[in-house]
A protein has these predicted regions:
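Amphipathic, Lys/Arg-enriched alpha-helical "gate/interface" segment within cytosolic domains
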Residues: 2-121
């Protein structure tokens, strides 16, 4: 799996490439957790195009199960990319993203530059 390890401020991140295996459900989480543990990273950065479409259908329960698994392993998650078309289709998803972005464990952000700013705040 293609990824890079980066240090932003005092946090080590595993930044996954745009191309690669999809994160379809909680069974796939270990593919993304292993590199984080290997490099003692505190955050996983994953492009939103690596998330299966069902992730954004909150009724499926996939988003909750996947994100809870990362949190159980004490890993923060930044999901990077434009999800505005999906947000326009779902008030529930808008609420979910807004609440996630208020916290410290899971963030939906448009870019790595925005993540760097947020980590510096």
């Amino acid at each position: 799996m293609s990824y890079a390890v980066q240090q932003i401020h005092d946090l080590r991140l595993v930044v996954f490439a745009e191309a690669g295996p999809m994160l379809k459900d909680e069974n796939d989480v270990s593919l993304f957790i292993a590199p984080a543990f290997e490099h003692e990273a505190g955050m996983i950065v994953l492009p939103v195009n690596r998330l299966d479409a069902t992730f954004f259908q909150l009724r499926s329960g996939i988003a909750g199960a996947v994100l809870q698994k990362f949190i159980n392993y004490r890993l923060r998650v930044a999901l990077l990319g434009d999800i505005s078309p999906r947000l326009a289709q779902s008030c529930a998803l808008q609420d979910f993203v807004r609440e996630a972005n208020r916290g410290e464990q899971v963030w939906f952000l448009p870019s790595l530059a925005e993540l760097e700013q947020r980590l510096g705040a």
